[in-house]
Amino acid sequence: VEVLTQTPSPVSAAVGGTVTISCQSTKSIYBBBYLAWYQZKPGQPPKALIYTASSLASGVPSRFTGSGSGTZFTLTLSDVZCDDAATYYCGGADYTGYSFGGGTEVVVKG
C-alpha cells in the first residue's frame, strides 16, 4: 500500500480565507479513482468530502475543491467558516489496498 503524506498540522486559517492541504503519495493512485478526502471532528465519524480526486460528495458545499492526479493531490477550502475547523484526511488505493494520510488539523481564527 502506498504511503500518503499530508501537509503538517496545524494549519491556521482566517474566516473568509482560503486553506490548501496537500497529499503526496509514494505510488500513483490507481486511475485517480480511489483518492478521497475526509473531514473528522471530535466525537463524530469521518465525513466524506471528495471522491475520485475532485468530485464533491453529496451535501458538501462547493467551497471544498479537490484536484490533482497521479501522486500529487490537493484539497482547497475557500471562504473558510468556523465550522470548517477539523482534521482532514486523504485516503487512497493502489492495487494492494487502501491507506490514509496522517491528517491535517485546520484551526480557524475569527
UniProtKB/Swiss-Prot annotation:
Residues 1-23 are annotated as: Framework-1. Residues 100-109 are annotated as: Framework-4. InterPro entries: Ig-like_dom, Ig-like_dom_sf, Ig-like_fold, Ig_sub, Ig_V-set, IgV_Light_Chain. This chain was obtained from antibody to p-azobenzoate and was isolated from the serum of a single rabbit. One of its GO terms (cellular component) is immunoglobulin complex. Residues 24-36 are annotated as: Complementarity-determining-1. Residues 52-58 are annotated as: Complementarity-determining-2. SUPFAM superfamilies: Immunoglobulin. The record marks 98 as: At the hapten combining site. It comes from Oryctolagus cuniculus. It comes from the Eukaryota. This is Ig kappa chain V region 2717. Residues 37-51 are annotated as: Framework-2. Keywords: Adaptive immunity, Immunity, Immunoglobulin. GO terms for biological process: adaptive immune response. Residues 91-99 are annotated as: Complementarity-determining-3. The lineage of its organism: Eukaryota, Metazoa, Chordata, Craniata, Vertebrata. The keyword Cell division does not apply. PROSITE patterns: IG_LIKE (PS50835). Residues 59-90 are annotated as: Framework-3.
